[in-house]
């Protein structure tokens, strides 16, 4: 049985470390990936979601510049500083005004902190948000959302925009205002100032992007500051103006990331003035505050510019070399990001000179920024977050509890404890008495006794073991390795410290020379307390049969040894005080010819005494006593009774359970070794390579240690279904109680869902979903963290309570994964398969709408680049539909079917089958709207709900309609599409045929009957190109037409036979019904109506006129060869819609009991 190694495996604890440190600080932060386009957000905590009002699903994959929080009062200069901070490796603090989802404005201090990986490269950014104050929305009549409505509606015209700013914000704003004036404090010549191209255009909020080459400076009217004289008085006397700046060249668009097609960057060049006086005077807001207070500049954690290393030296620099170096660096153009979507524009390559300047800027990301992270985020000196697999952090002079040294030391202490358990009772009973009776020993001190020296060494080793235990790591309840010395000491004090301390006291040294040898012998027996730790140490071998038997035999022998020492002590204590020689020692001396003399001396040797005593205890414990050594005195008899009682218990507990122990031990180990043998045989047979073989073996060992080889499903199957549901409800209670989509569900629905959930345990590094895998399940994370990668780029980090998969209600068939899902730590996930979830929701339709509306998938794994008409997609969908056959449809009887089936557009069915959200959309003829992100379900280019893979225009099978009326009798929208709620365009054409088949009980007619599943309302429709070419080959179309022809021939044959049967039944009833009839009715009471043929009553409703639709439908086989095929891809269609026969017969058909719609 392998030792559990779960707590020592390397884990990526980056996210857990950040969350654990921020729990008690009420932090609000997001984590962005620096290697993807726009530095997309890959994680946001609950505090940030509460701050901005957005959910985690809405924030994921957005640019970390938080442009979705921008509004009319958001300073473009502050947004430019955040964007510039994303280029470098230095931490930066920016004060900016943001807007919540409900439209309320707040002033926020943003900390942009880079995070490096094991190679030292910055791959992530942590943005911490701290609310400075809530801004007063002066003149704002209503709180609109920050992404809707024109910006001019926020403030009344003619009123000043005033902010109540704190002093740090005012100073920072003054610095930004001063930097816009030539030669002012903090001008562009300062190396620490943020230099961007500015103009005086008003700040207009952008919906998707922030163009930093159009950043404007805030004027006095927007900032709400006093006159310029008050600002100068606040800062102090500034340096004289240095003249007007040089004209700025027109900015050119460049790209810093050739791989990211979704974004581009622009470079803005600014020539700074060579004004050293302004640089020495002040270069940042911190220096201004220091000048104002008359104190030296405070120590700073952050840099407000890109030239932070030069700042401290330039304030006091007097040499020409320093000034020349500053002038050279100040000529480097500043770099700003431009998050503008330029997907349609070609890639613009930057000149060679610009590349040489950009390269050092990008290389700054490889600086060591870990200390900055800990200082800014207050993580503590012992926590350095790095996104990598981290081994447990161990303090200096700390010993790992699983290290080889600790293992060897434990075995050494174990041997010393066994020595103590054997020799301490023997020394106390035999040797001390022998020393008293023997001749006087020479005066050579303590070293003349060999056992005393060994005892002294044992005492020293026990004391050293106590010191080592104070520096040995342990595993806490969370399976974390604790290496902090203080926590280790507290844990040891609460555990084994008292027992170890008592066992390590050197009583021989403390009472040496006092003459009380008997007292020393009794006190030394306290070392036997260490046997408790030995039992715990040997408990890990309790599943090995041979080890258990050996330990039991050793325990039996040790108890016999202790009892032998006590048996000798009793006889030796009574021997000098007995007048009659009846003790067992006197009998032993007489038997071996070594009797005791009158003075009590002489007698058998120590060897004879010990062997005889051990012989007696063994024979008494095993109840085999021969009687040659027998108790004679009362004390000996009482002790013998006690030995017999102990022997009976020992004999019953040990030897009586030997067979049971062997069976139990070999049952567990046999299962483990059998399964391991199968795994190794599988590896050998298939020639698995070594890396994959190691992963297989490690996963098997970890899974065995986690479940102990118990199949939970097999255990549950042994209980009744009601008890299984209760157990599953208990196992999934945390998910069902705290996950929002499951709130409001009935007890029966929760029990049904709990039965379908499966728990998955994944170790670090295990890949749960590979790119391109079929998404057949929905995953809910209950513990641990995972990462989602596209190639080698991390696109998302998900933690507890996150959901990933695909929105099952939007697609009729499962899609493919667009990335790899890999575990960072030990994870527990709940997953439910697609078919199981849809089956439960069909059984509870009243809960289905609430579930789909409240379900927020944190990351959508569906690949949006799939081509709907690609080869093999039809076979995939057909196989999926055949696999998922739901024969029962739990639909409310109050739900009415649409009156007419509708018509499929010739340009594609996406216009009519997009659901209610696709009607009345003013965005264009297709109702399109810009997508919010690459992972949103609206931006999918795959087939949507209700969409078929090939365009089709179906010839109607009903009576002609007026010219201006569309098929189905429903009005058209502005762009000509029909506003129909139905999702089945062919249901009307085949409704008559399906009702006939359901009446005659054709089981094959119910095989593919499913309710049309309409999608939930979505913000935007899928964009379908007008010229969508048919991707199916001509042979496939002809094959499908031939199959339809054969099916119709079979149906025609069956219909003819059924009609003949109907006619025969009608002829038999000619004498029982009136001559003039149009339908068979139940005859009235009379002498001739002896019986009523109930099964025949609905038959005459199927007249030949009502079957004319079948003949029209069979004429479909004569369509020209180039006619388009019938749609095979799309949502499952319900073929039996009784509302479609209204135009064919005045009397409604009687619905058969097996019809799903009944």
Curated annotation (Swiss-Prot):
PAS domain boundaries: 17-88
Phosphoserine PTM positions: 239, 283-284, 319, 350, 870, 873, 1136
Positions bearing carbohydrate: 597
Residues on Cytoplasmic side: 1-402, 471-494, 541-546, 659-1158
SMART domains (alphabetical): cNMP, PAC
PTM section of the record: Phosphorylated on serine and threonine residues. Phosphorylation by PKA inhibits ion conduction.
Compositionally biased residues, Low complexity: 927-938
Regions annotated as coiled coil: 1034-1061
Superkingdom: Eukaryota
Domain notes: The S4-S5 linker acts as a signal integrator where it both couples voltage-sensor domain (VSD) movement to pore opening and closure, as well as providing a binding site for other domains that regulate activation and/or deactivation of the channel.
Protein name: Voltage-gated inwardly rectifying potassium channel KCNH2
Organism from which the protein derives: Canis lupus familiaris
């Amino acid at each position: 049985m392998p030792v559990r190694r779960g707590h020592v495996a390397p884990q990526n604890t980056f996210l857990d470390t950040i969350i654990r440190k921020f729990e008690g600080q009420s932090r609000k932060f997001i984590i962005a990936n620096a290697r993807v386009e726009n530095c997309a957000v890959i994680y946001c905590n609950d505090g940030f979601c509460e701050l901005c009002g957005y959910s985690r699903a809405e924030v994921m994959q957005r640019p970390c510049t938080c442009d979705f929080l921008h509004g009319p009062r958001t300073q473009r200069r502050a947004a430019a500083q955040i964007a510039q901070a994303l280029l470098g490796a230095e931490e930066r603090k920016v004060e900016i005004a943001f807007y919540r989802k409900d439209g309320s404005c707040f002033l926020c201090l943003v900390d942009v902190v880079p995070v490096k990986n094991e190679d030292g490269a910055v791959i992530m950014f942590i943005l911490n948000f701290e609310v400075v104050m809530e801004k007063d929305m002066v003149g704002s009549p209503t709180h609109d959302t920050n992404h809707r409505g024109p910006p001019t509606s926020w403030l009344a015209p003619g009123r000043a925009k005033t902010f109540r700013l704190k002093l740090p914000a005012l100073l920072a704003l003054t610095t930004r205002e001063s930097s816009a004036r030539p030669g002012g404090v903090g001008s562009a010549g300062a190396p620490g100032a943020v230099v961007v191209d500015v103009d005086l255009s008003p700040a207009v909020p952008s919906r998707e992007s922030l163009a930093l080459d159009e950043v404007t400076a805030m004027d006095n009217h927007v900032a709400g500051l006093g006159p310029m004289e008050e600002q100068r008085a606040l800062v102090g006397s500034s340096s004289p103006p240095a003249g007007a700046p040089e004209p700025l060249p027109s900015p050119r668009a460049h790209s810093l990331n050739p791989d990211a097609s979704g974004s581009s960057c622009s470079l803005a060049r600014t020539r700074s003035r060579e004004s050293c006086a302004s640089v020495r005077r002040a270069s940042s807001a911190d220096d201004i505050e220091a000048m104002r207070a008359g104190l030296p500049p405070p120590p700073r954690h952050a840099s407000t510019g890109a030239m932070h290393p030069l700042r401290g030296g330039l304030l006091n620099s007097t040499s020409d070399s320093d000034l020349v170096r500053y002038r050279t660096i100040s000529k480097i153009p500043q770099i700003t990001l431009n998050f503008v979507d330029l997907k349609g524009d070609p890639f613009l390559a930057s000149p060679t000179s610009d590349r040489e300047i950009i390269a050092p800027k990008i290389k700054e990301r490889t600086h060591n920024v870990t200390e900055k992270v800990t200082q800014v985020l207050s993580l503590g000196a012992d926590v350095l977050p790095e996104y990598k697999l981290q081994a447990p952090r161990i303090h200096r002079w700390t010993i790992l509890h699983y290290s080889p040294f600790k293992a060897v030391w434990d075995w050494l202490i174990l041997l010393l404890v066994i020595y103590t358990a054997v020799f301490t009772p023997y020394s106390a009973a035999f040797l001390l008495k022998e020393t008293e009776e023997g001749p006087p020993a020479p005066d050579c001190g303590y070293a003349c006794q060999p056992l005393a020296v060994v005892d002294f060494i044992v005492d020293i080793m026990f004391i050293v073991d106590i010191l080592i235990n104070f520096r040995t790591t342990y595993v806490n309840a969370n399976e974390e390795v604790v290496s902090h010395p203080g926590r280790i000491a507290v844990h040891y004090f609460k555990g084994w410290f008292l027992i170890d301390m008592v066992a390590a006291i050197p009583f021989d040294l403390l009472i040496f020379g006092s003459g009380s040898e008997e007292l020393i012998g009794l006190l030394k027996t306290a070392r036997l307390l260490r046997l408790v730790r030995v039992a715990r140490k040997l408990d890990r071998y309790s599943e090995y049969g041979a080890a258990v038997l050996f330990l039991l035999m050793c325990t039996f022998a040790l108890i016999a040894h202790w009892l032998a020492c006590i048996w000798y002590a009793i006889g030796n204590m009574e021997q000098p005080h007995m007048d009659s020689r009846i003790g067992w020692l006197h009998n032993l001396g007489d038997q071996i010819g070594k009797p005791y003399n009158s003075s009590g001396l002489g007698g058998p040797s120590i060897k004879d005494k010990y062997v005889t005593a051990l012989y007696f205890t063994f024979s008494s414990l095993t109840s085999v006593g021969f009687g040659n050594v027998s108790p004679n005195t009362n004390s000996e008899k009482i002790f013998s009774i006690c030995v017999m009682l102990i022997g009976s218990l020992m004999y019953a507990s040990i030897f009586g359970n030997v067979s049971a122990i062997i069976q139990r031990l070999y049952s567990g180990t046999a299962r483990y070794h059998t399964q391991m043998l199968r795994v190794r045989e599988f590896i050998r047979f298939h020639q698995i390579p070594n890396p994959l073989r190691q992963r297989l073996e490690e996963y098997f060992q970890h899974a065995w240690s986690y479940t102990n080889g118990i199949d939970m499903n097999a255990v549950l199957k042994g209980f009744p279904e009601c008890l299984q549901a209760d157990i599953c409800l208990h196992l999934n209670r945390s998910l069902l109680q705290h996950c929002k989509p499951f709130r409001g569900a009935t007890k029966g629905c929760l029990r049904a869902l709990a039965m379908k959930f499966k728990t998955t345990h994944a170790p670090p590094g295990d890949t749960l979903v590979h790119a391109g895998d079929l998404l057949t399940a929905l995953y809910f994370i209950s513990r641990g963290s995972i990462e989602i990668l596209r190639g080698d780029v991390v696109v998302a980090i998900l933690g507890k309570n996150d959901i990933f998969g695909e929105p099952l209600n939007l697609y009729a068939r499962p899609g493919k994964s667009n990335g790899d899902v890999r575990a960072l730590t030990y994870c527990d996930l709940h997953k439910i398969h697609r078919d199981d979830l849809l089956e439960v929701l069909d059984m509870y339709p009243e809960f289905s709408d609430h579930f789909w509306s409240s379900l927020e998938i944190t990351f959508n794994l569906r690949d949006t680049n799939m081509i709907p008409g690609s080869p093999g997609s039809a076979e995939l969908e057909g196989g999926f539909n055949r696999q998922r056959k739901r024969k029962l449809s739990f639909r409310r009887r109050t739900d009415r079917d649409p009156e007419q089936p509708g018509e499929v557009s010739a340009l594609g069915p996406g216009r009519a089958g997009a659901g209610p959200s696709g009607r009345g959309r003013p965005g264009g003829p297709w109702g399109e709207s810009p997508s919010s992100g690459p992972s949103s379900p609206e931006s999918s280019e795959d087939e949507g709900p209700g969409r078929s893979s090939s365009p089709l225009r179906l010839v109607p099978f009903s009576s002609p309609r007026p010219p201006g009326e569309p098929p189905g009798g429903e009005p058209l929208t502005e762009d000509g599409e029909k506003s129909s709620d139905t999702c089945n365009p062919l249901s009307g054409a085949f409704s008559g045929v399906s009702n006939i088949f359901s009446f005659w009980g054709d089981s094959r007619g119910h095989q593919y009957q499913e309710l049309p599943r309409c999608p939930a309302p979505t913000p935007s429709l899928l964009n379908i190109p007008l010229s969508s070419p048919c991707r199916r080959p001509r042979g496939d179309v002809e094959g499908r037409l031939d199959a339809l022809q054969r099916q119709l021939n079979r149906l025609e044959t069956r219909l003819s036979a059924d009609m003949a049967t109907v006619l025969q039944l009608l002829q038999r009833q000619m004498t029982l019904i009136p001559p003039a009839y149009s339908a068979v009715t139940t005859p009235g009471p009379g002498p001739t109506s002896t019986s009523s043929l109930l099964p025949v009553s609905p038959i005459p409703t199927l007249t030949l006129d009502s079957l004319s639709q079948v003949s029209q439908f069979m004429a479909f086989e004569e369509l020209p060869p180039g006619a388009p095929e019938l749609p095979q891809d799309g949502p499952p269609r319900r073929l039996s819609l009784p509302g479609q026969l209204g135009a064919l017969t005045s009397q409604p058909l009687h619905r058969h009991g097996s019809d799903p719609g009944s």
